[in-house]
A protein has these predicted regions:
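Nucleotide-sugar donor-binding/catalytic module of glycosyltransferases
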Residues: 1-201
Length: 201
């Protein structure tokens, strides 16, 4: 889904997929006429998945860390009774890393077995994946405020209820870097932290 981009993204994606030999493996769903936000788009896309399919959250300005990421995830879900996974990601600063000696690893980390609740510091970040049926158990009203989908902190709105439902036996933290987070995009939430984001959380 293209959320009303203004930089020719839609045309580039459409043409790239149309000319690709495996274009039958990709569905280009829609270009929104009005921007509706990340969480609303995630909800919209999830309705197109079957219950046992695994949803992988990848933002358009980020990328998977390597070509075997989906194989890693497939192995996790195929060999254990896992309902959701999270982690791990690295910040991609491109050419303007403010501290070249800084650890690029993001905030994802294992949830203590006795702390599967939303009072614990949020560590369930990229790469986020989950079974569609688990996502469907989140009440729609819990993804909204005053009738509208949350515009910020959508990862909290999604992951807290799912990790509570999964518990330590069915949620898995993956230590290996699977995701590269574009840290130079001025529209990223971590650059927009302020009163609005605090209210959303």
């Amino acid at each position: 889904i293209d959320d009303e981009s203004t930089d020719n993204t839609w045309k580039i994606i459409y043409n790239t997929i149309y000319d690709h030999p495996r274009k039958n493996k990709v569905r280009v769903c829609a270009k929104n006429r009005n921007r509706i936000g990340v969480l609303a788009n995630h909800y919209k896309m999830a309705q197109m998945c079957s219950d046992n399919e695994v949803i992988v959250n990848l933002d358009g300005d980020d990328e998977l860390a390597h070509k075997d990421v989906l194989n890693v995830l497939s192995n996790v879900y195929d060999t254990s009774d896992i309902w959701m996974t999270y982690g791990s990601f690295a910040y991609d600063y491109e050419s303007r890393n403010p501290d070249p000696n800084a650890d690029p690893r993001g905030i994802s980390g294992p949830f203590p077995a006795d702390k599967h609740e939303r009072t614990y510091f949020f560590v369930c970040s990229h790469l986020r994946t989950y079974k569609k049926w688990l996502f469907s158990k989140i009440r729609l009203e819990d993804l909204k405020r005053d009738g509208d989908f949350y515009q910020l902190a959508m990862d909290h709105a999604l992951m807290f209820p799912m990790i509570e439902m999964s518990g330590p036996d069915h949620a898995k933290y993956i230590h290996d870097i699977l995701y590269l987070y574009n840290a130079v995009n001025v529209l990223n939430e971590h650059t927009l932290v302020g009163r609005e984001m605090v209210m959303e959380v």
